Design a protein with these regions (language model features):
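Mature-region segments of soluble proteins
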Residues: 1-172
């Protein structure tokens, strides 16, 4: 998941390209969505630093701590009880959870869903290019291995290239 999240934070979303960033910064309602003066990359940097400081202050080595202690600390972050420098740790937790779920179920080309594990878990077939013959067959089993966008492009089906064979390039 780190590769997926790092990619998102380095891109337009992480830099807040589509976020209104001119204030004023009043406390918003949950229905109003993201209401911080930080872009997502800044939120991650700020809150990860705050979480690390809080763990150090408690003498808690997160990876080595018992599962119960890790769960209890994550619950505190989720409930907004960890100070993130004036920002709610709940917003950070919500963002981190959403990015983790996105990465787990995204196409592997985005850096998450290694070996299509998320898709295999739920039985999602992935990015097959041609469902035309199947879309009216409701309730039909579809027992194929998942395929990613990159896999579909590499297969080069004949129906994608009229007059040619799979894998054959035609130059005019």
């Amino acid at each position: 998941m780190p590769s997926y999240i790092d990619g998102q934070l380095a891109g337009a979303w992480g830099q807040g390209a589509r976020l209104y960033a001119s204030g004023p910064w009043a406390q918003g309602l949950p229905s109003q969505g993201y209401q911080l003066a930080l872009n997502p990359a800044q939120l991650y940097r700020t809150c990860i630093g705050a979480v690390r400081r809080e763990l150090a202050a408690r003498g808690l080595d997160f990876p080595e701590a018992p599962a119960e202690a890790r769960d209890a600390f994550l619950r505190e972050v989720e409930e907004g009880r960890v100070d993130c420098g004036g920002f709610s740790s709940a917003v950070f937790f919500e963002t981190l959870l959403a990015n983790t779920v996105e990465g787990f179920f995204s196409d592997p080309s985005y850096g998450g869903n290694r070996d299509m594990a998320g898709w295999r878990m739920i039985g999602f077939p992935g990015a097959y290019a041609a469902y035309l013959q199947l879309y009216t067959h409701h309730g039909m089993r579809f027992d194929r291995e998942p395929t990613a966008m990159g896999d579909a492009a590499a297969r080069r089906h004949p129906h994608d290239h009229p007059g040619g064979r799979a894998g054959e390039h035609r130059h005019g």
